[in-house]
Amino acid sequence: MSLNFLDFEQPIAELEAKIDSLTAVSRQDEKLDINLDEEVQRLREKSVELTRKIFADLGAWQVAQLARHPQRPYTLDYIKHIFTDFDELAGDRAYADDKAIVGGIARLDGRPVMIIGHQKGRETKEKIRRNFGMPAPEGYRKALRLMEMADRFRMPIITFIDTPGAYPGVGAEERGQSEAIARNLREMSTLRVPIICTVIGEGGSGGALAIGVGDKVNMLQYSTYSVISPEGCASILWKSADKAPLAAEAMGIIAPRLKELKLIDTVIPEPLGSAHRNVPVMAASLKAQLLADLLDLEGLSEEALLNRRYQRLMNYGYC
């Protein structure tokens, strides 16, 4: 896979281009008198070291860019790498099937679970079909239908959060966007099964929170979680989206800061260069965390689980 490099990664991109060029020359002419292998290896080591240096000092705005990276793994990618026997379920049984939300029954190391997550899409047609990962009310009602099914059959619920926010269109508002989100918040707080939520990319406002009320809330290292996008915040406070980097720093949208505030439980480390650089490794780390969380929650009685979730919600805002 050819990598897309962000602006702050351009020094890495230049090194990778040199590596690709030398590798291509070496393959095209095996009769070259000079050995390029040592030079290629030297450049690769230099690229790794440079990547470590750049990623060791990322700001909140750079993390926000990584959270939106077009090659970042989405919900369906993690389903493919982590779960088996996935059977997708569709529709809210009231209006339509919103493709911005995917969900269904699968097995996690043999254990039946219900998976629900946002899905953005890769190519233009798929992005449009999935509305860029911005669900309408029917998407959240589909999610709730699947959660209630999981509750009836005593299956743990695993959600993957990755959305700029709930869709703000006129049609969505007419069909009750705010009601759908609010109902999910209420109902998720009373479900009798373990709920594990993970922010895998963008965690945008109520659109993220609508499938984010859980017993465990995790974030990938280079994901974000906020009430508004940095650009939106900058447009309100400074009347200019150009101030987005400043807004990102002020808002505290990155995983380590949110863990300090006790809004999330775990920051899951990503491979060097972010999740899209090594999806299998990222999926393995995420799977290990999900299994650990399930093990922690499965031993709780229904009453203890609900009391713990209630206390978690009541403690928000207290550091």
UniProtKB/Swiss-Prot annotation:
Pfam families: ACCA (PF03255)
Chief location bin: cytoplasm
Catalytic activity: N(6)-carboxybiotinyl-L-lysyl-[protein] + acetyl-CoA = N(6)-biotinyl-L-lysyl-[protein] + malonyl-CoA
Keyword presence, Cytoplasm: yes
PROSITE patterns the UniProt entry points to: COA_CT_CTER
EC category name: transferase
Keyword Nucleotide-binding tagged: yes
Keywords, comma-separated and alphabetical: ATP-binding, Cytoplasm, Fatty acid biosynthesis, Fatty acid metabolism, Lipid biosynthesis, Lipid metabolism, Nucleotide-binding, Transferase
GO terms for MF: acetyl-CoA carboxylase activity; ATP binding; carboxyl- or carbamoyltransferase activity
Pathway: Lipid metabolism; malonyl-CoA biosynthesis; malonyl-CoA from acetyl-CoA: step 1/1
EC number annotated for this UniProt entry: 2.1.3.15
Biological process according to GO: fatty acid biosynthetic process; malonyl-CoA biosynthetic process
GO CC terms in record: acetyl-CoA carboxylase complex
Domain (CoA carboxyltransferase C-terminal) ranges: 35-296
Subcellular location: Cytoplasm
Task performed by this protein: Component of the acetyl coenzyme A carboxylase (ACC) complex. First, biotin carboxylase catalyzes the carboxylation of biotin on its carrier protein (BCCP) and then the CO(2) group is transferred by the carboxyltransferase to acetyl-CoA to form malonyl-CoA.
Family: Belongs to the AccA family.
Subunit structure comment from the entry: Acetyl-CoA carboxylase is a heterohexamer composed of biotin carboxyl carrier protein (AccB), biotin carboxylase (AccC) and two subunits each of ACCase subunit alpha (AccA) and ACCase subunit beta (AccD).
Protein name: Acetyl-coenzyme A carboxylase carboxyl transferase subunit alpha
Organism taxonomic ancestry: Bacteria, Pseudomonadati, Pseudomonadota, Gammaproteobacteria, Enterobacterales
